């Protein structure tokens, strides 16, 4: 195993454990929405997609997260509006990630989205 792959493994385990042990607030019922969010900044090679994916699963959101060729990350997040806003706020609070800009666009809810995946 190379040093780089060992580092990635350590980082991924750290991210998974952080999300697993995160004390989530209690959420009231809220309107189901779907957003496409483009995150710019230091968002690739820092465990960003993994963190979004793991937290989205804990929040029972559906959608996906993927790297874009220009260095940004695009996420489609679907679920209760308050849970989506919590996920975005949480990601903005992380020190190892630096979101310099985010662009949110509301999309039509997609009833065929049944899970959250990292692409």
Language-model segments: which ranges?
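Intrinsically disordered, low-complexity, mixed-charge
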Residues: 1-119
